[in-house]
Amino acid sequence: MEARCDFCGTEKALIYCKSDSAKLCLNCDVNVHSANPLSQRHTRSLLCEKCSLQPTAVHCMNENVSLCQGCQWTASNCTGLGHRLQSLNPYSDCPSPSDFGKIWSSTLEPSVTSLVSPFSDTLLQELDDWNGSSTSVVTQTQNLKDYSSFFPMESNLPKVIEEECSGLDLCEGINLDDAPLNFNASNDIIGCSSLDNTKCYEYEDSFKEENNIGLPSLLLPTLSGNVVPNMSLSMSNLTGESNATDYQDCGISPGFLIGDSPWESNVEVSFNPKLRDEAKKRYKQKKSKRMFGKQIRYASRKARADTRKRVKGRFVKSGETFEYDPSLVM
């Protein structure tokens, strides 16, 4: 009895899909596996002509029959008879009727490949168009990188400041090998006079007003008291090298410059003598209410232990003579 297609139930099943464990005709194979790119990856093969349950592994050229691995050894024993066998490899994707005929030209009859409906090529073309549209989305996303300079999220302010301040010769005449380092004076660490960086700050303010870019307060902290204006001067600039990370560190965070320390308010609370006395009183009250060591759990054992004789603190066994002379112990 011929196996029928599991999808339509009317046509003869010729294809076996291992992923779906389904027997399909040629038309249903195209319709099912052209739905999305995931179904195109399913590996399919011809259906065994003997058992109609497993995919074919070989094609016997002498008997012109396609067999699975089990039917090859049990039903026909083509290997033992010395028949010419052709190995059949599974296929994927959705080949057109012309391509399908080329794949199984030596296996299927020409009348079988003609059973495929003519609209199968149209479905494959629509699927290719769908795949092409997905690549266009990626192309549009990559084109956004060309317009990144128009977004206000990123600014070229550090580079402009570097170009403006590069001609000031801030580090001219500085020899770090011989210069004494003084970390106590924040204004004069390298043992020379304070560097003039007012031009950089003036240009930074003018650049901010012209371009109307709202810089966060972290880049320009409020200067109060004896706080020194921070400079983006790194050791790499002294040697002639440049690095993008040199301009990310703008100095001390404003959280350490403005306001009181968060831990100063808790100092008085932890050393308050009144709270300490109240805690000691609560501890003594709980200690006086403890029952550990005062409760007799086994009254009968205690009564017997009080009457038993002891030698050096240990009980004397029953039946033994009790001879104890304290003078001998001394």
From Swiss-Prot:
Origin, by domain of life?
Eukaryota
Zinc finger (B box-type) in chain: 5-47, 48-88
Report the locations given in the UniProt record. Answer: Nucleus
GO molecular function ontology, one term from the record = zinc ion binding
Q: Name one GO cellular component term.
A: nucleus
Metal-binding is among the record's keywords: yes
Is-annotated flag, keyword Repeat?
A: yes
What family does this chain come from, according to its entry? Belongs to the CONSTANS family.
Q: What is this protein called?
A: Putative zinc finger protein CONSTANS-LIKE 11
Protein source organism: Arabidopsis thaliana
